[in-house]
Amino acid sequence: MVQVNENYLKLKAGYLFPEIAKRVKIYSQSNKSAEIIKLGIGDVTEPLPRACIDAMSKALDDMGTAEGFRGYGPEQGYSWLREKISEHDFISRGCQILPEEIFVSDGSKCDSSNILDILGKDNSIAVTDPVYPVYVDSNVMTGRTGDALENGTYQGLTYLAINEGNNFLPELPQKKVDILYLCFPNNPTGATITKEELKKWVDYALQNKSLILFDAAYEAFIQDNDIPHSIYEIEGAKDCAIEFRSFSKNAGFTGVRCAFTVIPKNLKGLSSTNEEIDLWPLWNRRQSTKFNGVSYVVQRGAEAVYSLEGKKEVRGLIDFYMENAKIMKNKLQTAGYKVYGGDNAPYIWIKVPDQMTSWNFFDFLLQNVSVVGTPGSGFGLSGEGYFRLSAFNSRSNVLDAMERIINI
């Protein structure tokens, strides 16, 4: 009989969001008339920008002609999209990222997991706590951790707590760590990082020859001018950081699937014989072998994000969701809740009432007012006592949910 990858057996009971879905399903089956409002998973709700729809429609028409038909595209992404990304997302901010350093993909969730394919298994790893679960679970699945402990952490990982005490900004590791996962604006806490604080991490990575895996999936939601949108705004970052970006949240592409990862050509790693190895060719080979590229139609839709009309419509989507976040934060604070995030990110991070755990509060809201959020403990040990609400929903649902919660 075939042997299984036993690393999967080390995973905790279930990925956070399937566990939420299971509880909601049980509740809905017993309360068939309940009008459930889901503010849990960070999925968008508003229609795609018209500029993107028109571009994809035209691309489909192109595919229906002999002249315009496209088969397999470049695994790295079409040059015209990579050039737009380079110009608008990086060069415009003073970041000298070349088009060929950009790899178009079908999701930053995939890329942040798949990047491990080109990194050795003996690297030491640090994650924030709480943390986006994919960072931890993907390392468990690939055998880079020890066993799960009773408190939900894993042997072999360094956890960097983020909480009220440190303004949700992790302290630098006390020892040398090879791989550092950072996400700003942060999921799940909604916290942001200044250029001065981010420079400390870049300096640490350069000094220790570490690699930063920087998730900037929510950079488009930044409202304050002094907050960096890219780690490459920090001098030296091209020598120590990989950045993940996505069209999912800013342009509503969660169901369309398009993202990109930046692998600067400066980046190097070490072989077992201490030979310096460029990371760019390794990722290029990985993608060429394991990935067939994002469809032509989808990439034309992503390209339209950078058109004048596309930028305007994307800005409208971001403003809409951030207004949702503002409404949620204001109403919850008025009701006496201690609330974080929501100013430069589409997530609200709530301190749950005393004597309640995060899952207690989840069940309390579900059972009493049919509102679904995400228990903070699902993001890590330091997330216990907190609760995440997402601003990705219709205005009417957000207003309804807030009224339900504050009137319990």
Curated annotation (Swiss-Prot):
Binding site for substrate: 15, 42, 109, 132, 187, 292, 388
Catalytic activity: (2S,6S)-2,6-diaminopimelate + 2-oxoglutarate = (S)-2,3,4,5-tetrahydrodipicolinate + L-glutamate + H2O + H(+)
N6-(pyridoxal phosphate)lysine, modified sites: 249
EC number: 2.6.1.83
GO MF annotations, alphabetized: L,L-diaminopimelate aminotransferase activity; pyridoxal phosphate binding
Enzymatic class: transferase
Cofactor list: pyridoxal 5'-phosphate
GO biological process: lysine biosynthetic process via diaminopimelate, diaminopimelate-aminotransferase pathway
Binding site for pyridoxal 5'-phosphate: 72, 108-109, 132, 187, 218, 246-248, 257, 292
UniProt keyword list: Aminotransferase, Pyridoxal phosphate, Transferase
Recorded metabolic or biological pathway in which this protein acts: Amino-acid biosynthesis; L-lysine biosynthesis via DAP pathway; LL-2,6-diaminopimelate from (S)-tetrahydrodipicolinate (aminotransferase route): step 1/1
Alphabetical list of InterPro entries matching this protein: Aminotransferase_I/II_large (IPR004839), DapL/ALD1 (IPR019942), PyrdxlP-dep_Trfase (IPR015424), PyrdxlP-dep_Trfase_major (IPR015421), PyrdxlP-dep_Trfase_small (IPR015422)
Assembly behavior: Homodimer.
Family membership noted in the UniProt record: Belongs to the class-I pyridoxal-phosphate-dependent aminotransferase family. LL-diaminopimelate aminotransferase subfamily.
Function: Involved in the synthesis of meso-diaminopimelate (m-DAP or DL-DAP), required for both lysine and peptidoglycan biosynthesis. Catalyzes the direct conversion of tetrahydrodipicolinate to LL-diaminopimelate.
Protein name as annotated: LL-diaminopimelate aminotransferase
Organism listed in the record: Prochlorococcus marinus (strain MIT 9312)
